[in-house]
Amino acid sequence: ANISIMGTSGAGKTFTLQLMALRMRRKGIQVFIIAPLKGHEFLRACRNTGGEFIQISPASKNCINVMEIRKTDKSVDELLDGAPIEKSELAAKIQQLHIFFSLLIPDMNHEERQLLDEALVKTYNKKGITHDNESLENPDDPGHYREMPILGDLYDILVATPETKRMANILNRLVHGSASTFNQHTNVNLDNKYTVLDISELSGDLLTAGMFVALDYVWDKTKENRPVEKAVFIDECWQLIG
């Protein structure tokens, strides 16, 4: 089910949204809140409920690694539907990353998209990850995935080739520049039952990149174990579609 909350400025839309989120959390429903504006308004309630407040911004130490292939619990789905159709998790992740880079580099041409695809495959291959899903498993830590690449690993491959150096130059902002906080391994709790993703300090092309990172994570979690109730709230949604 979908709900839209509308009203004039100051009518209490954010308050109503937060009240609904807190009541759902009290009922045991997993809650995700994405805040493109006024993220600080969710901080106090988030802390008081033991939630995870994730601030995605160049100045923040928080990071969700956009290149991470996340291990998801599909045990309940398998009980309901039987063994799933085997699909390459690497291929699915790379398709998502193509969307991320199309937002970051909107004028990318067809040749560059192909070269980017090859660079992404090579980046994961260097970590021992192939289209065989079993390659994701960490042989030194059973039950967990291997260490994932970060944007800096991709940058090193792109910058080494003249044909992909333009893409590397644009990506450099997120690797060595003012937004290098994106170039880290995930350092936040992604399993908390009350998660607020604050992207209010982002603007321009970084807003679209940050929104992708937030939605990519939320989508991964909502697909996990479908019988488990989850609620996704987006405050000031117009900021993202306007």
Q: Which positions does each model-derived feature cover?
A:
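Glycine-rich phosphate-binding loop of nucleotide-binding enzymes
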Residues: A1-P58
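P-loop NTPase motor domains
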Residues: A1, K38, R47-G51, P58-S60, ...
